[in-house]
Amino acid sequence: MDHAATMRRMYDLLNAGDVDGFGDELADDFVDHEELPGLAPTKEGVKTFFRMYIAAFPDLRMDAEDILTSGDKVVARSRATGTHQGEFMGMPATGKAVDVQLIDIIRFGDDGLAYEHWGVFDTMTMMQQLGAVPEGPPA
């Protein structure tokens, strides 16, 4: 199976706002090891998160810049962009653009579905871009 193609398809589905289609790529017993504040680390929890995220950033784009595969795992170094147009995690819309880097690691099963996810998202940069956290001094 071409797990890299599945990873790209998952991003494409999110870019199209198709959270249910994205969810179809997840196994029923999917586990997310990346903390989603206030949400269960399950298939339904992840779908809820992306519904909230897309409501807040309706022009969300997730683009894989590099994809590496090894056995049943895929690693994507990606970029998420969008404009904050709705409430997100208690923060009212700011109208500001975000451009954030992230890493996704997915373990796929023999059936081609995603069973586990580990991720790192540059939340600090996003909060600085939204004006919720002051930017630090230049490096």
Predicted regions and their residues:
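C-terminal and inter-domain tail/linker signature
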Residues: M1-A139
